[in-house]
Amino acid sequence: MKIPSQQVLLALPLLASPAQSYPGKHPRCSAGDACWPKEHVWQDFNSTISGRLIRTFPAAAVCHTAQYDAAACSVAKERWTDSFWRTNQTGAYSAILWELGEKGQCFINTPKEDRCDQGIVPYYSVSASGVKDIEKAVKFADKHDLYLVVKNTGHDHLGRSSGSGAFSIWTHNLKGKEWHKSFKPKGAPSNVSGIPAVTLQAGEQLLDVYKAAAAEGVTFAGGSAQTVGAAGGFMTGGGVSPFSHFYGLAVDNVLEVNLVTAQGKAKTINQYTDPDYFYALRGGGGSAWGVITSVTYKTHPKPTHIRVGIAQLNITTEDSRRVVIEKTLQALPDITEAGWVGYGVYATEKSNPTAFQVIFLQPNATMENFNKTFEPMNEIATLPGVTGGAVSYVFPDFLEYSKNFLRDPNIATNVIDASRLVSRQVLTERARDLVDLMFEYPTTGPGFNSIVKVNSDERDNTAVHSSFKNSRALISFSVDWADNASEKEKKAAKKTSAEVSKRLAEIVGKETGTYLNEASPYEPDWQNAFWGDKYARLLSIKRRIDPKNLFVCNRCVGTDIILEP
């Protein structure tokens, strides 16, 4: 594909200001800078990757004058909140915030003549078809000192896969699944036995993997989403799963990673080829460690069934709301220690008659187990001013459960989270403090992105925060704003997110971390909250494998890019 030079020139005025430079930090070359490669240089590079260079625009650009396409605009409007559609667009992200940035405008339902800014969507992207494309792209970025980002599906809560004036490597189209009856990592000693596994190319998405796993008769410990990439940031961030109680986090199941390094070389990383690098990849976060091309995971036996428990507690008097929230918080540790994994939301606003909703699941659980475990929920429902209770459903496998309950929430919104892992002690002894925080910030949608006692047998062998060992849930507070919100309104919401992070840290203890894939992009104590005492080791590994700091992203190990509220 040849990109007309006049198209580039016309687009340049639409750019937001170049990537921020920080005093004393490494200034990278962004679109609009004098150091940005000339058009003929880009065209020469494009010829080496079979025309896979894409001039990238925000998802709504097809509905505005410069890039207007009536047919494409109609599809975009129809499928604007469809996560399957958005992951197939080079310039689309799950959150509009990471397309438009602080001041950008390019909205889907505004008149054709309205302005459409570049925002923080990368200026150029390489739609990688294989390892060679990625090797060439990394070397090109290194040669020209470009601001380089890596994008898979764009499900990124921390804004790590976009950047103003950046050059992007897009791995979404790397597809392929290979199921192994007996897999041995490269370099493993002869006495190491092979185990069942699956090798997933970077672009594979969770729902497709679940469908294939069902056909293979195995279980894959992926996340609670449909379109999230199974072999990208989900894994490097830890990867909480509905099966984490039994099989741990996604990183605990990783046997091997194939990637392209900062030197533009393809490598296979596992516990035998490079133990430190393998440690960093399993929980070190974001794209700080290279461009992942495939991941090999353990697989597990298929359960006989999936039992689901759903509880809903409604209030008929407002005085009951605090009581319901506090008592359910205190009940959660026993439920998850009995092997149930769940997701729940609280409502503190007076207009909502439902105080608490939660869904749990457990493979192979019996009805007797359900009745005993959820008895506290039914007891809460008998309190004055409270109705509801818990019910159970059974599905033949996880795929059938997925068809009924798996969704991709908050698509095409501006939602950001503030979160912390919480222990049994916090849930039982500091429940009232958590309730007070919920009522202090009633519009933040408090809830649990996961309720799970994680199997942490591998915790010391991965970079994931050690507080997962004692956690029983991930409590989260979310803020959002309308696309057309004022700059003042946006800043207020972001500051609220940062404030809640601080308050949560005070309640749970500053030594307690969070799940970095669902953390605040403005987390003030990010090194400690994401990795704790593991950060020093990670930084040392980062300096060895990426001495020029080519791979950078917001609040990633060794980064000099720190987004501020």
From Swiss-Prot:
Residues 118-302 form the FAD-binding PCMH-type domain. GO terms for molecular function: FAD binding; oxidoreductase activity. GO terms for cellular component: extracellular region. Belongs to the oxygen-dependent FAD-linked oxidoreductase family. This is Uncharacterized FAD-linked oxidoreductase ARB_02478. The modification Pros-8alpha-FAD histidine is found at H155. Keywords: FAD, Flavoprotein, Glycoprotein, Oxidoreductase, Secreted, Signal. The keyword tRNA processing does not apply. Glycans are attached at N46, N88, N191, N314, N364, N371, N484. Its main location: secreted. Its cofactor is FAD. It comes from Arthroderma benhamiae (strain ATCC MYA-4681 / CBS 112371) (Trichophyton mentagrophytes). Residues 1-21 form the signal peptide. It holds the Pfam family BBE. It is found in: Secreted. Its EC number is 1.-.-.-.
